[in-house]
Curated annotation (Swiss-Prot):
Family: Belongs to the NADH:flavin oxidoreductase/NADH oxidase family.
The name this protein goes by in its record: Putative 12-oxophytodienoate reductase 4
An annotated Gene Ontology molecular function: oxidoreductase activity
EC nos: 1.3.1.-
Length: 380
């Protein structure tokens, strides 16, 4: 066993993604992070026992996992069977999942989410309109999904939404999570306030960059006050244009938000999504669009956005990121750190099973490497 451990350590030393890292108060054994991935298998918005297997398959000692996006209230939902953390039933359902991940020695972060206008009346309490920064509907696209016309939040209603995030963070800590990640990305409620294409308000939550970011800053402040900056991270995507949500100056937006994070000493991490990958000589290439934010942020910086093993190793070696979040590759390869250790081929993901409600197919049935393979490092 000692010889195996020495072999693993030697292998990791040559692979930047597999080197240890200290994130705040947490000691990580490698830098491969499970990105938050919506899986639509929490029937009735309650996490189910099959999630124990899904997450523990991807848990390694000293690894970092982020949950699928988890609703903060009954107005936060926009997709079928996504989990929540606003009721005691949901909190109790998360506890055995968190315990199982911890038994594998991994760290577990709960991503807190409100979809805003990315919803339809059928997902809303009493069939009401989804809430947003605006009353403008998302423009229908080729997907065939038509989101309902939203209702613009009144200024006096916003403190209640902030409190929903605060209570959800408290619930996450009660459920045993090591911390929370605020979902401030991909066109959902917080981005609907931040980005000027979706925010047409004339109150203190609209207009200037500072005003548009006020809502998310107040959410951050409330959660930090509730659970401590050392337990709070955030995901941001200033360059992304999902759900009719785009900003005319993404660098200014991202820079302003990072400066707000720096006001909280010990803030756990900033998790950012890359701009679209460039294609150079037939290969996807990182554009390094996140570099200004990396330089500005005082804490742990996580990069996400279509990385493979080679690019992940490069950005760690170059100091462009501290950690790299993997989504589809980790979904299809529950032993992804082990595969990276020996440069093993990866299972191909099946996009058609990403969002089905089956508790096994496309969820917990992706194969592991042969455990008897003599070359396999023991990231398990």
């Amino acid at each position: 066993m000692a010889r195996e451990a020495e072999k693993d350590a030697a292998a990791a030393a040559e692979i930047p993604l597999l080197t240890p890292y200290k994130m705040g108060r947490f000691e990580l054994s490698h830098r491969v992070v499970l990105a938050p991935l919506t899986r639509n298998r929490s029937y009735g918005n309650v996490p189910r026992p099959h999630a124990v297997l899904y997450y523990t398959q991807r848990a390694t000692s000293g690894g970092l996992l982020v949950t699928e996006a988890t609703g903060v209230s009954d107005t936060a939902q926009g997709y079928p069977d996504t989990p929540g953390i606003w009721t005691q039933q949901q909190v109790e359902a998360w506890k055995p999942i968190v315990d199982a991940v911890h038994r594998k020695g991994a760290l577990f972060i709960c991503q807190l989410w409100h979809v805003g206008r990315v919803s339809t009346n059928e997902y809303q309490p009493d069939g009401q309109a989804p809430i947003s920064s605006t009353d403008r509907q998302i423009t229908p696209d080729d997907s065939g999904i038509v989101y309902s016309k939203p209702r613009r939040l009144r200024t006096e209603e916003i403190p209640q939404i902030i409190d929903d995030f605060r209570r959800a963070a408290r619930n996450a800590i009660e459920a045993g999570f090591d911390g929370v990640e605020i979902h401030g990305a991909h066109g959902y409620l917080l981005e609907q306030f931040m980005k000027d294409s979706a925010n047409d308000r004339s109150d203190e939550y609209g207009g200037s960059l500072e005003n548009r970011c006020r809502f998310v800053v107040e959410v951050i402040d409330a959660i930090v006050a509730e659970v401590g900056a050392h337990r709070v991270g955030i995901r941001l995507s200033p360059f992304i244009d999902y759900m009719d949500c785009v900003d005319s100056d993404p660098v200014a937006l991202g820079s302003y938000m990072v400066q707000q994070l720096n006001k909280h000493p010990g803030f756990l991490y900033c998790h950012m999504v890359e701009p679209r990958m460039a294609i150079v000589e037939g290969r996807r290439k990182i554009t390094h669009g996140l570099l200004p934010f990396r330089k500005l942020f005082n804490g742990t910086f996580i990069a996400a956005g279509g990385y493979d093993r080679e690019e992940g190793n490069k950005v760690i070696a170059d100091g462009y990121a501290d950690l790299v979040a993997y989504g589809r590759h980790f979904l299809a390869n529950p032993d992804l750190p082990k595969r990276f250790a020996i440069n093993a081929p990866l299972n191909k993901y099946n996009r058609s099973t990403f969002y089905i409600q089956d508790p096994v197919v496309g969820y917990t049935d992706y194969p592991f490497l042969d455990e008897k393979d003599e070359g396999a490092a023991t990231y398990a």
